[in-house]
A protein has these predicted regions:
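Conserved N-terminal segment of class I S-adenosyl-L-methionine
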Residues: 1-96, 100-104, 117, 217, ...
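Short, glycine-/aromatic-enriched active-site segment of Class I SAM-dependent methyltransferases
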Residues: 7-13, 131-152, 156-164
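Short conserved AdoMet
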Residues: 57, 76, 111, 125, ...
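Feature marks short, surface-exposed loop/turn motifs that line or immediately flank catalytic pockets
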Residues: 71, 138-140, 179
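Residues lining the SAM
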Residues: 104-107, 133
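Conserved S-adenosyl-L-methionine
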Residues: 168-178
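A C-terminal cap/extension of S-adenosyl-L-methionine-dependent methyltransferases
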Residues: 180-254
Length: 254
């Protein structure tokens, strides 16, 4: 991938409704669930162009790691915290090093996701926290997943099962992006049905949801407003039984 791609993605992460509101939701959840943490040491795995790392700076020092070497080099040019290239399957850090370890929409990109969460657990301090977000429900699989090289989508029980071997406990979990769940599900299922009805064997060109829905204008504002309902719902202490995405917070045993 060239620098032009990462420049586009830089703006996408800072302007698109999904990235903007997700970041706001995550900051609020971290602040609430970790009891207004300050001066903690966080590791952000899969930092991309750094917006989640910027968000984590609110809570203390941040180390970032990104698998894509070119993306890492691009982000190093402006990120205010350290970022290095590396893999979630072999994190280049000592055991028990970080108060908070985050993997926001990362483990779905990894074939050996069990090894991935074990590495997150390994570098987390005893009594520290791991925060994970993933796309939800395999029946929502579509071109967005293919173009982003996902291996899977998750249910709540599947994510719990993945974390079960780790020593510690889940302190919080919920689906989110839920007010848009039914429209998005209907759209994806309709696209799949129409393709089947057409009788064509070849798949249409894969397009990301971010490309389909765009980042500018009234569509972005409307979808941002709807997604903000999730923010207020979760901030009020409520949870969702279904959604396009899923989040979980895990506390490592002391």
């Amino acid at each position: 991938m060239d620098q032009a791609y990462f420049k586009d993605y830089y703006h996408l992460e800072r302007e698109h409704w999904w990235f903007l509101v997700r970041r706001k939701i995550l900051a609020e959840r971290i602040n609430t669930l970790l009891n207004r943490p300050r001066q903690i040491h966080s590791l952000n795995v899969g930092a991309a162009t750094g917006t989640t790392s910027d968000m984590l700076m609110e809570f203390g020092e941040v180390m970032s790691i990104e698998y894509d070497e070119e993306c890492c080099r691009f982000t190093q040019g402006f990120l205010q915290t350290p970022i290095i290239q590396g893999s979630i399957l072999d994190l280049p850090f000592e055991d028990n090093q970080y108060d908070l370890v985050t993997a926001f929409d990362v483990i779905e990109h990894v074939e050996d996701h069990q090894k991935a969460v074990e590495e997150l657990w390994r570098v987390c301090k005893p009594g520290g926290h791991i925060a994970i977000t993933v796309p939800a429900f395999q029946f929502l699989w579509g071109p967005h997943d293919e173009i982003n090289h996902h291996f899977r989508r998750y249910t709540h029980s599947q994510l719990l099962q993945l974390l079960e071997p780790l020593k510690g406990k889940v302190i919080y979990s919920t689906y989110y992006n839920s007010f848009l769940f039914f429209p998005i599900a209907a759209f994806r299922l309709l696209v799949r049905f129409l393709h089947t009805l057409s009788g064509k064997k070849e798949q249409p060109p894969a397009r990301s949801d971010h490309e389909v829905l765009g980042i500018h204008g009234w569509i972005n504002r409307i979808l941002s407003g709807i997604f903000h309902l999730d923010y207020y719902w979760l901030k009020a202490g409520l949870r969702f039984p279904a959604g396009v995405s899923l989040m979980i917070f895990f506390k490592k045993s002391d």
